[in-house]
């Protein structure tokens, strides 16, 4: 697939099946762990640090799987799923720019939760700003991110780290 600046749900599913960046390279998780419905913009320049950016969206629907179990009679999207979406997006970005290997989250410096996603909400928007990209034997992205719910920033993550590994045997 050619490098584009936006991706549909069906194209994200191709990535989840390993059909986008080639065998053994970056993949997104399959649903229900795929935490966004589309990538609305991805670019290797721009963003807060001029090192690249990616924006994705999740349509919030009351029938999303996590609302039934987190929590019974008090449905809320788990914060860790928003954080995982951010790692997913950094991994996608590394594959999109040509990095080789399987993606693994390597950590995060700081996370702040200032709000919640509830079944009546409409739209989650993730914004990732790459701070540093290493494309050598080590392939790694470091980024800051925000998650908005219906236009209000509710999560912030600084120094998200994702690496691509050609072998995960010793990981």
Curated annotation (Swiss-Prot):
Localization terms from the record: Cytoplasm
Coiled coil stretches, renumbered: none
Complexes and interactors: Homodimer.
A GO term, aspect molecular function: (3R)-hydroxyacyl-[acyl-carrier-protein] dehydratase activity
Catalytic activity, EC: 4.2.1.59, 5.3.3.14
Catalytic activity: a (3R)-hydroxyacyl-[ACP] = a (2E)-enoyl-[ACP] + H2O; (3R)-hydroxydecanoyl-[ACP] = (2E)-decenoyl-[ACP] + H2O; (2E)-decenoyl-[ACP] = (3Z)-decenoyl-[ACP]
Protein name: 3-hydroxydecanoyl-[acyl-carrier-protein] dehydratase
Function (record text): Necessary for the introduction of cis unsaturation into fatty acids. Catalyzes the dehydration of (3R)-3-hydroxydecanoyl-ACP to E-(2)-decenoyl-ACP and then its isomerization to Z-(3)-decenoyl-ACP. Can catalyze the dehydratase reaction for beta-hydroxyacyl-ACPs with saturated chain lengths up to 16:0, being most active on intermediate chain length.
Predominant cellular place of this UniProt entry's protein: cytoplasm
Organism: Methylococcus capsulatus (strain ATCC 33009 / NCIMB 11132 / Bath)
Example of a GO biological process term: unsaturated fatty acid biosynthetic process
Active-site annotation: 70
Taxonomic lineage from the root: Bacteria, Pseudomonadati, Pseudomonadota, Gammaproteobacteria, Methylococcales
Pfam families, A to Z: FabA
Keyword terms of this UniProt record: Cytoplasm, Fatty acid biosynthesis, Fatty acid metabolism, Isomerase, Lipid biosynthesis, Lipid metabolism, Lyase
PANTHER family associated with the record: 3-HYDROXYACYL-[ACYL-CARRIER-PROTEIN] DEHYDRATASE, 3-HYDROXYDECANOYL-[ACYL-CARRIER-PROTEIN] DEHYDRATASE
A cellular component term, taken from the record's GO annotations: cytoplasm
Annotated InterPro entries: FabA (IPR010083), FabA_FabZ (IPR013114), HotDog_dom_sf (IPR029069)
Family membership: Belongs to the thioester dehydratase family. FabA subfamily.
């Amino acid at each position: 697939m050619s490098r584009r600046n936006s991706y549909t749900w069906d194209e994200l599913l191709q990535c989840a099946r390993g059909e986008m960046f080639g065998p053994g390279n970056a993949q997104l998780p399959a649903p229900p762990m795929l935490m966004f419905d589309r990538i609305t913009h991805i670019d290797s320049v721009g963003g807060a640090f001029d090192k690249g950016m990616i924006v994705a969206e999740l349509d919030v629907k009351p029938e999303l799987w996590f609302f039934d179990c987190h929590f019974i009679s008090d449905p809320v999207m788990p914060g860790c799923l928003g954080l995982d979406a951010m790692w997913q997006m950094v991994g996608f970005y590394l594959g999109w720019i040509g990095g080789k290997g399987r993606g693994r989250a390597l950590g995060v410096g700081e996370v702040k939760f200032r709000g919640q996603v509830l079944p009546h909400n409409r739209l989650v928007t993730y914004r990732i700003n790459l701070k540093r990209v290493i494309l050598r034997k080590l392939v790694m992205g470091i980024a800051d991110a925000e998650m908005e719910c219906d236009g209000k920033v509710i999560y912030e993550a600084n120094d998200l780290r994702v690496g691509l590994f050609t072998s995960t045997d010793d990981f």
